[in-house]
């Protein structure tokens, strides 16, 4: 029985291999990958890109660590796909950055079959919302920019969606996959979005327009519910919930996003709701300056994998969610089997689980991530109203400003769940916590570790292990703030004075 699962996503002449980190592997561990029995490469990360492969060919990959095979997989490269060039007949899209190409691009997408790929050559293609379908590929060549407008009308109609844990009608996203239905399985599957280009939307300008428009639309409601508004993070929270995402996936399965820059959604950049087997790798997420501008958000979704990505975001790089009280408890679809590795933050809040976690979050594994340049680092959070659970979390070989497991007071509006959340069964191994968070371009001292459960009996934070954790601060001494904890194990906790 192999120790690690090995997976492959392939194109016609290349494939990306990725695998679980073996339990004995530490930071910088070396792996040797064999292809059809011959050594292909040695690497110090749990993924490898293979090139110059034959199309429609079968391969076997074996991954060796410490002299033994820890996992293997077989994969087949795809046929060479027929290009549907959007700039050619009968579509005639113009990459001049001025012409609105929504209709032309949608026609190309609608014409794309399983053996085709919608192809965008270099250029800037201005567009409104687009709707993808099953069994298709969208490819952006180097220099290609799919640029969403900053005009509200281009993101009509509103569609069933979910935002901050509550189902509602939101503006269409730039790329829309699937139709939301929490009672059903996938209705959009086998989609590839890849290349070397950029997918960007209207960012802060579009967000501000939508918030202002929605605030006017809701002015009587907001005035009548001043207490509800006061419970929110700020006055933009309620009118901002209808903003589009950059890429929205509802009830999707088997989607691969690879190699792109994903930039300036009006809210979150990649949002997966009630979806399964979503793979995102070798992408850059950019949304600095966009309020609430998360990067990659699996929401009541399973088997989602993120690796080799860089984040410069206006909020969380990653936010794992599963609904908000009480609706999230009733729908009861957890986020589970989420794997995040070899990712780096240059700005933003870091990797977060919650706070919308009423449907549950479990089996989250994070390794080999550098979140030094973030504000929150690694954060697991909920509010007392949420209900639900977070359990089965493992974080290994990461650097971050801090580690927080705690309750938060914001985004706490709405009817409470019948009981408080339960946070349990977590392991944090070989972490470096710098005690310095990046905010607004500068570093500030922060508490490196915060551990707190909830005050109701049976809802304490429990069964948590800290092992080989190094903490840096000004003094070289550490007082751990612990509250409502049970079964906390600490091994090899070191505190050093910052030089």
Which residues does each PLM region occupy?
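Extracellular/periplasmic carbohydrate-active domains that bind, remodel
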Residues: 1-499
């Amino acid at each position: 029985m192999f120790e690690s699962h090995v997976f492959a996503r392939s194109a016609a002449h290349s494939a990306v291999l990725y695998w679980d980190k073996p339990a004995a592997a530490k930071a910088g561990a070396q792996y040797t990958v064999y292809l059809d029995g011959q050594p292909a490469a040695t690497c110090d990360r749990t993924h490898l890109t293979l090139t110059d492969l034959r199309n429609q060919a079968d391969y076997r990959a074996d991954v060796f660590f410490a002299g033994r095979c820890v996992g293997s997989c077989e994969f087949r490269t795809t046929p060479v796909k027929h290009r549907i060039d959007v700039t050619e007949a009968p579509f005639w899209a113009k990459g001049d950055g001025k012409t609105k190409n929504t209709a032309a691009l949608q026609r190309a997408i609608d014409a794309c079959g399983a053996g085709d790929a919608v192809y965008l050559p270099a250029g800037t293609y201005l567009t409104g919302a687009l709707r993808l379908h099953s069994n298709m590929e969208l490819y952006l060549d180097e220099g290609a920019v799919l640029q969403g407008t900053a005009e509200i009308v281009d993101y009509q109609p509103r569609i069933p969606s979910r935002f901050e844990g509550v189902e509602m009608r939101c503006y269409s996203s730039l790329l829309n996959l699937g139709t939301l239905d929490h009672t059903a399985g996938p209705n959009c599957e086998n989609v590839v979005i890849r290349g070397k280009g950029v997918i960007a939307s209207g960012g802060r300008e579009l967000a501000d327009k939508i918030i202002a428009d929605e605030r006017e639309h809701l002015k009587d409601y907001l005035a009548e519910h001043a207490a509800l508004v006061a419970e929110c993070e700020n006055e933009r929270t309620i009118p901002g919930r209808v903003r589009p995402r950059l890429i929205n996936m509802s009830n999707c399965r088997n989607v691969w996003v690879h190699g792109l820059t994903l930039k300036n959604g009006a809210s979150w950049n990649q949002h997966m709701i009630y979806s399964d087997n979503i793979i995102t790798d070798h992408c850059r997420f950019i949304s600095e300056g966009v309020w609430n501008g998360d990067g990659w958000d699996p929401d009541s979704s399973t088997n989602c994998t993120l690796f080799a990505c860089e984040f410069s975001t206006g909020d969380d790089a990653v936010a794992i969610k599963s609904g908000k009280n009480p609706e999230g408890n009733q729908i009861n679809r957890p986020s589970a089997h989420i794997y995040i590795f070899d990712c780096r933050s240059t700005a933003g809040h870091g990797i977060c689980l919650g706070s919308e976690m009423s449907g549950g979050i479990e089996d989250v594994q994070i390794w080999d991530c550098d979140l030094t340049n973030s504000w929150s680092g690694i954060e697991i959070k909920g509010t007392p109203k949420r209900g639900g659970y977070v359990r089965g979390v493992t974080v290994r070989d990461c650097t971050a400003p801090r580690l927080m497991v705690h309750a938060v007071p914001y985004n706490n509006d709405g009817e409470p769940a019948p009981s408080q959340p339960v946070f349990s069964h977590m392991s944090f191994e070989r972490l470096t916590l710098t005690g310095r968070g990046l905010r607004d371009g500068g570093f500030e001292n922060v508490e490196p570790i915060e551990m707190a459960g909830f005050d109701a009996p049976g809802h304490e934070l429990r069964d948590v292990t800290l092992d080989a954790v190094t903490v840096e601060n000004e003094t070289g001494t550490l007082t751990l703030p612990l509250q409502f904890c049970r079964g906390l194990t600490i091994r090899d906790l070191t505190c050093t004075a910052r030089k």
